[in-house]
Amino acid sequence: MSLFGALMGDFDDDLGLMNNHMNHTMNAMNMQMRSMNRLMNSFMPDPFMQVSPFDQGFQQNALMERPQMPAMPAMGLFGMPMMPNFNRLLNADIGGNSGASFCQSTVMTMSSGPDGRPQIYQASTSTKTGPGGVRETRRTVQDSRTGVKKMAIGHHIGERAHIIEKEQDMRSGQLEERQEFINLEEGEAEQFDREFTSRASRGAVQSRHHAGGMQAIMPARPAAHTSTLTIEPVEDDDDDDDDCVIQEQQPVRSSAGRHYSSAPTAPQNSGNIATAAAPTPTSSPTTYDTSNGNNNNYVSSRRSYLRNGHGHSLATPRRPLRTPPSSPLATVSTSPSIHPHPYAANPRRQQRAVKHFHTEDEAASSYKAVKRGKKK
């Protein structure tokens, strides 16, 4: 192996070890952040759980940004220049007075420490805004270089706010808690939290009612088109047993959108066929209701007929009717036509018997006799 190949192999090994160590560090930090999040939720529950950003009442706001910032050293909690838009996003009245919104932003940087281990810094902030100026803010920071994790949750109603911040040292396990009151006394904190919870819950109900109202004004779907197919046996002089008449009964739609069943109409044939279409006293018609809305009513009726156990005598459509003798189409007109056929008998062109002559003299004499007769 060449020297270049050996160096590249060592570099790949070092890169793999670094990636494994970084993944292990990230997983450990994520587990620690989840544990702190559970700790904060146990102390101050989230009243916006009913109105999560994935519900119908929430709308993603256009101010949501995910800035791509270069790697910079940390400068304290939420005061570093690497997060210049956090305060603007948190302080803006995103949801207004009639809606709900959710905004979140996250920044993460990675650098190599003196010992070659990766140092990861991650900070995130989120804001949930409800109707009536109700707002909840969450800020988290975790730094593997200092081993410090911080989380702050604030409840805001207009200009009043109650913020609880917790800081934990992962190396020593020490946990500190601080509270901040804005335009609020410490003795009013409990009453303020109850007011915040009630307003947030009421805003969630209003958002859901608004979403339901939008669905209520949608036009109702029209009723499914239904048709009734009737198969009746027919008496016929033939010996065939599979003659029948299939009648399709279509509903009549009124202006109010209701369906009224129309009476079946008789076949548009001659009088004999209309009489033959009546059912016999010994057999009752079978009716199948098809509501699939397509034009293949005959196939659907046959499937229903088979499912009912009548497969031994399948109903087939009637064959083309033979023309009865009484029909004008079956008789030949005897009246003379104004356009006689060219091969018909014509008195002006009568066939004459052909005479046969045995000699030329007989033929010549006959020709002369005919010629003399024409001259006369």
UniProtKB/Swiss-Prot annotation:
Region (Interaction with DREF): 96-202
Molecular function in Gene Ontology: DNA-binding transcription factor binding; protein-folding chaperone binding
A Pfam family per the record: Mlf1IP
Low complexity: compositionally biased ranges: 274-318
Biased composition annotated in UniProt, kind: Polar residues: 262-273
Cystine crosslinks: none
PANTHER family: MYELOID LEUKEMIA FACTOR
Family according to the record: Belongs to the MLF family.
Protein name: Myeloid leukemia factor
Originating organism: Drosophila melanogaster (Fruit fly)
Taxonomic path: Eukaryota, Metazoa, Ecdysozoa, Arthropoda, Hexapoda
Annotated gene: Mlf
